[in-house]
Design a protein with these regions (language model features):
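Dinucleotide-binding Rossmann-like beta1-alpha1 core, especially the glycine-rich loop
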Residues: 140-231
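Active-site/ligand-binding neighborhood in enzyme catalytic cores
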Residues: 238-390, 401
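Glycine-rich active-site loop/strand segments that organize a redox cofactor
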Residues: 47-48, 52-55, 130-161, 305-328
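Mid-domain catalytic core of redox enzymes
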Residues: 380, 384, 388-512, 516, ...
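N-terminal Rossmann-like FAD-binding beta1-loop-alpha1 element of flavoenzymes
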Residues: 93-120
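Glycine-rich FAD pyrophosphate-binding loop
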Residues: 111-135
Length: 635
């Protein structure tokens, strides 16, 4: 199969090779070589004609130019190479570092309390939204959307009054929108089901298992390359009601399951053939970012993984569960809704709220197809300014933290360093950079901020000329436990605000592939570190090769030709992806108030911290709740 397309794919890294950055700071002199006014904000990159990041393909997410300055700051050699710091002369009521949902929500909450406050929001990426990015494609003359990061409105627990209130203020009613716009049963109405792709490198031969209704697991696996014993054990684990822990109460079983991995449960409790492990290994990737070796059995029980149906476990959360499993096992989770661009629409609605002239439209439905005017995001006359391509490199209280009345923030943009000032600062960036931005923090707080290691992941979005092969094979999504990407699925079908998803297999379609580059056998935080290194050292060409190879092998029996049927690729790489959630297998059970995320988010003078890391929960409601807390601490 050809590695390259018959026609070249449009892909480009925005201003490849040009250092891009974030930031702002106060008049003063806390950074080397501070000089007079030097920032021509109206001549900035984001004001250039045709500037529109959502439509870019190639490497997105943490794109080239978004992280290099922060890495130099981490490595201790930024300031020695930075040159003079230029004073912008700008002073604000609030500077927010990070234009993700948490940062934008912080700006929103601040203006709720302080009317016409002047706010500067800085972000190191070329687009706002943080992880809540969107990818736009024009296919067959029609706009097609897909999430580049945060997938949907969803949480293990009901949204708080604060988070729910923000959604309602923005005009988002998830329940009503879900009923009106989200066609969840569309693919099943066509007879499409889940598939499982067994790759030859892991299972000795390429084979697609279709999980068809009305068939047993023995029937589904009969022609697969799995050994007869592995087939029999998978069928037993999926279907049999066996108590593998006889003589124990439900609570006793739960306590034991909380301290063993699902892998150990399968091998040592259910006594499954070792070949079964590979079949289930990646099933936890999408939720936890690591395999079944690093996720407790009690965690996956909450997600109805097989093997527990005969244990007679009482419903409900249990001690020892992480935030995700405990939430779903207890409250059952929040309402859910998927915008066509994931939660990027929430970020766009927040920007409309803060800078109305930049985002046309009037409601939560029409924002989906709206085209942002990026040139209006950073205007001197606007009370709220959003400055992209600007990497914060310093945030310090002016004077002693206990008595400080203002803050200085420094940032790098276009190879220069600038400073601006404010009465307060919210750091809505990732926890791991904060000790380097605020070197004056107490050492114990710095250590707490460094504790969590964000989960790395890849969302690769691929444009297809049509999706006939999926229809021919009878699948809408495919789990691939041994492959480079652990899943591939057709885009969700959502019709909203004049935007309509494709319906015919003959029409162009977007599909998403997910990769979590974990390293089985290591503790989760070490797996995350290894995965971060893997992602940042993988070229677009390598991602593209694996996309073409894997889709070709899965879909070729349905008539798919990777060389001609793939028309565009966008790879969203997130080396610092999901917020770290404490893992019962590896992390202690801290007393109330002593967990690293709680210690790490403490206010420091006129600087407060807001992000999903601060909540130790990789969900949008956590990002919103932490933004509200940070603003309350500074108000």
């Amino acid at each position: 199969m050809p590695d390259r397309p018959a026609q070249s794919i449009t892909r480009r890294d925005i201003l490849n090779g040009v250092p891009l950055a974030i930031g702002g700071a106060v008049a003063g002199g806390l950074w080397p070589g501070l000089v007079g006014p030097g920032l021509a904000a109206d001549a900035a990159l984001q004001d250039a004609a045709g500037y529109y990041p959502p439509a870019l393909t190639g490497l997105r997410g943490s794109h080239p130019g978004a992280f290099e300055a922060a890495h130099r700051l981490r490595d201790g050699d930024f300031w020695s190479r930075a040159g003079v710091t230029k004073q912008t002369g700008e002073t604000y009521d609030l500077i927010v570092v990070g234009a993700g949902i948490s940062g934008l929500a912080a700006a929103h909450f601040w203006r709720q309390r302080h009317g016409g406050a002047r706010i500067l929001v800085l972000d190191n990426h070329d687009d706002f939204g943080g992880h809540a990015k969107r990818n736009e494609f024009t296919l067959g003359g029609r706009l097609e959307l897909i999430n580049g990061g945060t997938l949907l409105i969803d949480s293990p627990k009901p949204y708080s009054a604060v988070a729910d209130g923000l959604l309602k203020t923005l005009g988002i009613d998830p329940v009503a929108l879900s009923e009106k716009c989200w066609r969840r049963d569309f693919y099943s109405s066509l007879g499409l089901r889940h598939g499982i792709f067994l790759d030859k490198e892991t299972f000795s031969a390429d084979h697609l298992v279709v999980v068809a209704d009305g068939t047993s697991w023995a029937e589904r696996l009969a022609s697969s390359p799995l050994s007869p014993q592995a087939q029999a054990d998978i069928a037993r684990i999926e279907e049999a009601h066996i108590d593998y822990m006889p003589g124990l109460t439900s609570d006793e079983k739960k306590r034991r399951l909380a301290k063993m991995s699902y892998r150990d449960f399968l091998l040592n409790v259910a006594k499954a053939d070792p070949g079964v492990v590979a079949f289930y290994q990646a099933r936890t990737h999408g939720e936890w970012g690591v395999g079944i070796d690093a996720v407790a059995a009690l965690e996956v029980w909450a997600f109805r993984f097989p093997g527990f149906q005969g244990l007679d476990l009482k419903p409900g959360a249990a001690p020892g569960q992480g935030v995700t499993a405990a939430g779903y096992a207890g409250d059952g989770g929040s309402y859910t809704f998927h915008f066509p661009d994931g939660n990027a629409s929430i970020a766009r609605l927040l920007v409309r709220d803060l800078i109305p002239d930049a985002v046309p439209g009037a409601n939560a439905e029409d924002v989906v197809a709206a085209r942002i005017d990026y040139a209006k995001l950073d205007r001197a006359a606007s009370p709220v300014r959003l400055r992209l391509n600007s990497t914060a490199v310093g945030a310090r209280n002016v004077g002693a933290a206990a008595s400080a009345k203002e803050v200085e923030v420094a940032y790098t943009r276009g190879g220069e360093v600038y400073s601006a000032g404010a009465s307060a600062c919210v750091l809505a960036c990732w926890n791991m950079i904060i000790p380097y931005l605020c070197p004056d923090l107490p050492e114990s707080q710095k250590q707490a901020l460094r504790y969590g290691v964000k989960t790395p992941l890849i969302y690769a979005n691929v444009a297809l000329r049509n999706w006939r092969a999926f229809k021919a094979l009878g699948v809408s999504q495919v789990y691939a436990p041994g492959a480079y990407f652990s899943s591939a699925s057709l885009n969700f079908v959502v019709d909203i605000g004049g935007y309509a998803s494709p319906r015919s297999p003959d029409e162009p379609m977007l599909i998403r592939l997910v990769r979590t580059p974990c390293q089985p056998g290591l503790p989760e935080r070490d797996q995350n570190r290894a995965g971060q290194h893997d992602i940042l050292n993988t070229s677009f060409e390598t991602f593209e090769h694996n996309i073409r190879d894997q889709l070709g092998r899965i879909l070729k029996p349905g008539g798919f030709d990777a060389a001609n049927d793939i028309t565009a690729i966008t790879v969203n790489r997130w080396p610092h992806g999901y917020a770290y959630e404490y893992n019962p297998l590896f992390d202690p059970d801290w007393p109330d108030g002593q967990a690293p995320n709680v210690i790490g988010r403490a206010r420091f003078g006129r600087i407060a911290i807001a992000n999903s890391d601060a909540g130790a929960a990789a969900y949008t409601d956590s990002a919103i709740d932490q933004a509200y807390r940070a603003v309350q601490e500074l108000a």
